Regions:
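Interaction interfaces in information-processing and related assembly proteins
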Residues: 2-251
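Cys/His-clustered metal-coordination modules, chiefly Zn-binding fingers
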Residues: 216-304
């Protein structure tokens, strides 16, 4: 039976709006759990998206938190971008930095309307790609992986990213629900730790390592209803999945909040990089440059 270690011992349980990290030392595995409620509603409220796009963005935001939670330095940022030249969705962007989350979708409304109520990932994007970028703090560098946007969901595409770009066996589960109380979304990410590969055959060439197979089977048993159950804490989910393990260490991560970083100062700095003749073309009749933030839908009037 597992020993659930938390730091500190008296830490409250986590239900929503905060990341939960866990490790299973005996299986060389780590994981992240998150459930979004009010923060998700706040982000979505900035846009008037139709249901398929709302569902897509909700899943993407969960994935951004799960992947961002793998980077321990609060100053680091993870950006997920899905793009195509032929689909109803032209661009999806989400990023996560130190608990701050934001995202938006650019899409063709007319083409989307032709797809029906529950379009597949391929119907939304056509032939596209998924780019995931880790900008590490303190000068530790920046790295990016790009994979085809394939599978039945964004979660499957992210699994493929970890397999192909980082050679890390990964299982991801996401769940999204819309009802009268708003939109709720949650996710689980479990990985085989790189340290577990030392002295063994590389897992990206042989994905049937018994430790990983065992963890993946347990994690894969998680139901969408459990992920979304507001009365079930994230610690309880980890316990249900892995209670037979020798030890499961859990740690509460960052609180999640909407975090758009747009500002007049930021846009002025960007505009000042343009030649004066270009800025003149941008100004309206009042001499103001109007800038729209795609993430939060605010409009800024910049004198520059």
């Amino acid at each position: 039976m597992a020993a659930m270690d938390a730091t500190p011992d008296t830490a409250p349980e986590t239900y929503a709006g905060r990341l939960l990290a866990f490790t299973i030392p005996s299986r060389d595995a780590r994981g992240r759990l998150v459930r979004l409620d009010s923060t998700l509603d706040e982000i979505l409220a900035a846009h008037d998206y139709p249901p398929p796009i709302t569902h897509l963005l909700a899943e993407a935001l969960v994935l951004a938190v799960l992947m961002g939670g793998l980077v321990k330095d609060d100053g680091s940022q993870v950006t997920m971008q899905a793009q195509t030249e032929a689909g109803a969705v032209r661009l999806l962007v989400c990023d996560y930095k130190g608990g701050e989350l934001r995202g938006y979708v650019d899409f063709d409304a007319a083409r989307l309307a032709e797809l029906g109520a529950n379009p597949s990932l391929f119907a939304l994007f056509g032939k596209g790609y998924l780019a995931i970028t880790f900008d590490l703090a303190r000068g530790k560098g920046r790295y990016q992986g790009i994979v085809p946007l394939e599978g039945d969901s964004l979660a499957e595409a992210c699994e493929r990213y970890f397999y192909q770009s980082e050679q890390v066996p990964t299982l991801i589960r996401c769940a999204v629900r819309s009802d009268g109380d708003g939109v709720r979304a949650a996710g689980l990410l479990v990985q085989h730790l790189a340290e577990g590969e030392e002295g063994r055959e590389r897992l990206h060439t042989k994905l049937d390592h018994p430790e990983w197979e065992h963890v993946a089977i347990l994690a894969g048993s998680l139901r969408h209803e459990e992920l979304l159950d507001p009365a079930l804490s994230l610690e309880a989910i980890a316990w249900r999945l892995f209670h037979e393990e020798e030890e499961v260490r859990v740690e509460r991560g960052a609180a999640i909040a909407r975090g758009c970083r747009c500002s007049v100062e930021h846009y002025r700095e960007v505009l000042e990089r343009f030649p004066e003749e270009d800025r003149e073309d941008m100004r309206n009749e009042d001499g103001i440059v109007l800038v729209d933030c795609a993430f939060c839908s605010k409009q800024f009037g910049i004198e520059v």
